[in-house]
Structures are given as C-alpha cells and as structure tokens.
Amino acid sequence: MREILHIQGGQCGNQIGAKFWEVVCDEHGIDPTGRYTGTSDLQLERVNVYYNEASCGRFVPRAVLMDLEPGTMDSVRTGPYGQIFRPDNFVFGQSGAGNNWAKGHYTEGAELIDSVLDVVRKEAENCDCLQGFQVCHSLGGGTGSGMGTLLISKIREEYPDRMMLTFSVFPSPKVSDTVVEPYNATLSVHQLVENADECMVLDNEALYDICFRTLKLTTPSFGDLNHLISATMSGVTCCLRFPGQLNSDLRKLAVNLIPFPRLHFFMVGFAPLTSRGSQQYRALTVPELTQQMWDAKNMMCAADPRHGRYLTASAMFRGKMSTKEVDEQMINVQNKNSSYFVEWIPNNVKSSVCDIPPTGLSMASTFVGNSTSIQEMFRRVSEQFTSMFRRKAFLHWYTGEGMDEMEFTEAESNMNDLVSEYQQYQDATSDEEGEYEDEDQEPEEDM
C-alpha cells in the first residue's frame, strides 16, 4: 500500500541512492541478502512501501538504477548492499554522457530510455497503490541531469496523477566539477519546473560545510555527504513506513508546502547533527531539535533562509515525544521569527510526528522549507550561465547533438522568471491584496 518507486540516475544519483538503501535497510532490519533480521513487528508492517517481497521471503527494493556508463553501477553492485537489488533493474549504456546534458537528454539517453521505462513499468505494475516516484540525480553532469529529466518527463506523461519527488544536487558555488555545470543545471531546472511536483534542493558545498563545521570531520568524503542526504530522504518518507500520531505523505507534503505550482524547490535539513565522538553526551529534547532544525547552518543547500522569507515549512519529528510539545515549539519558532515568514499565509508551518526514531537515535527531525531565498541558488547558476552563453562558449558540444540555441534562451528566461516569482512573493505583504488582481496586464516595475 502507498508504494514509492525509487529511481537513481548518473554517478551522483547512484552513489546517493546506494547510501539511501543502506539507511532504509537498516531501519527495516533487512540484511544485505534481503532477509529480514529485525526484532520489531513495526519494521515489517509497512515494509512494502520501499520493498517487494519475493516468493522466497526475500525483500527486494523497488529501485531502478540507470546510468550511461557501467562504472558506478559496478561499484554499487559490489558495494555492501549490491546483491539486494533486482539484477534486471540495472539499466546502463556503455558510451557515457560526458557531462553533456544534450547527450543525456537527446542522443545517448534517448536510446536507453525505453529500456528504463520498461523496468519502471514492470515495477509500477507490481505496486498495489503507487504513491509516486522519487528520483536521485545531480544537475551538473550529463546523465543525472539530461537523462534524469528526460525520464521524469516520460513518467509524467504515463503517470500524470502520481507524485514526482526529486532529490537534486545543484552545482556548488565554489566547488565545480565541470565547466559546463551552469548549462546543464539551467536546462534541467527548465524541465523540473514543469514536470516535477517537489524538488529537494541539495548542494555539495553546503553539505561539506555541515560535515566540516557541525560534524567536525576534517576531510569529509562523498560517503559522509551522501549519508546526510540519505538521513533526510529517509525522514521525508518515515510517516509512510512507520505508524505515527500525525502522519504525512508525499501528497500532503506537496499540498502544505506549495502555494504556487512553480515554486516547488525546497530546502531540507536534518537534526540532530553531532560529531561522531560526542554523540552519546547529547541530551535530545524537542526544543533543541527545533532550534537546530531551523538553524541556517543546517540547510543542505547554499542559500541562506535569513535572506528571504518562508512561504511554508514542514517539520517531521521522529521518536517518542509529546505532540503538544512539538506544536508549542513550532508556534514558538513562528512567533519569535515572525519576520521570516510571510504573513499572508497563516499557519504556514506543518508538523508531523512518527513514533519510530532512526537507528541509533532517540529522536530526530527532518525539515523541509519553501523559502524565497532559494532564488540565490538559481541566481548564481543563472549568472554563470549568462556569462558563458553570451560568448557562446562550449555551445558546440550541445548543438552538435542536435540542440538549438533557442532552447538555451528559453531555459535561461524560464529560470529568470522563477527568480522573479520568488522575489515577488518575498516582497508581497498582506495589505497589497488588491494589487494582484491585474498583475497579468501590467508590467511590474521591480523586475
């Protein structure tokens, strides 16, 4: 019941996904061979959200793994939980996308997409009542961004009424892997705005900062970064998988977080984050969790919520705690920081409580916020995009795969529109109600 189909694409997506399955297997007491070794009935009660039970009693993840080169997939297959996946669900090409969005979206990816869709269909048919899809990918490369967005649009066509949640790793401001990241990211955002329902925005630099500052890791590896992401991913869906007092699911999350359909890019955070050594000395209380969860340093993307305002937010608490205390703390946050919330959406913070904490913690919380300050991410990518596109730098790699310059111009203006929309609602106040009736006709001055 309420199954979620997980899809991971590209190197980044597959590495995050592999880590995520380690976390979920751990929570449900499933060992690397797919056998259940847990102790609590609660682990099995709704295990079928993420797993299929095979005839021999093994649990197989509802996961589709795709990439345009075999490398990363081989390392997933030989990794700790590599044997748990269905062998047919590994779909890969041989050529690679070479960090080129056009290869992932139009040429190489388009050749592979049908075999991916076959696997997706097969998995979806195995579901009793499919809730939606979650996609892990990065926006800077070729496969995750190009082929990832292609798959999202194809799934959108075939399953228009199912939720589409993405965990998208944006290019970082200072750390860059490839020079064409701004192109790939802008072309991807153009697709995500139209075809995804909810995008959790992540970025390596913010994750590095958390590892470095909060977790006191001197040399964080991608494994550490991906562990943070997977904690958040597991938190977002814990209400579907374990009983709770105040439940939420992907659709409730969307209804509560998205006031305007295009503005569905969320910041995420997780608490408690403590360095490995000092874990056991920390007393966890709901106020402490709440404080850390709302802390700007805790956000997993390089945008500062203090530079904008929250349209909406949602907090998912896990563990044995009083619902009353959770509600009081959330109201408290809103009252103390009222200037950071838009006043024209009353009660814009939703909380949910799930009784089962993550492994090794007594309580934890996941934060998802829709803040106008996320425009900082888009602005930054857009500036980098424009400075290259103005000179038509590296463009031949894309036009050579059959793309047209028009597509770049469209993607650029779509991203700039998105930024303006966020800015417009950031500046809006509740006494301006009358002004919005005729906004379509009048050009706005502040754009």
Curated annotation (Swiss-Prot):
Mg(2+) binds at residue 69. Gene3D superfamilies: Helix hairpin bin, Tubulin/FtsZ, C-terminal domain, Tubulin/FtsZ, GTPase domain. Residues 419-447 are annotated as: Disordered. Its cofactor is Mg(2+). It is found in: Cytoplasm, Cytoskeleton. Residues 419-428 have a biased composition (Polar residues). The keyword Aminoacyl-tRNA synthetase does not apply. GTP binds at residues 11, 69, 138, 142-144, 204, 226. Belongs to the tubulin family. Tubulin is the major constituent of microtubules, a cylinder consisting of laterally associated linear protofilaments composed of alpha- and beta-tubulin heterodimers. Microtubules grow by the addition of GTP-tubulin dimers to the microtubule end, where a stabilizing cap forms. Below the cap, tubulin dimers are in GDP-bound state, owing to GTPase activity of alpha-tubulin. This is Tubulin beta-2 chain. The gene is TUBB2.
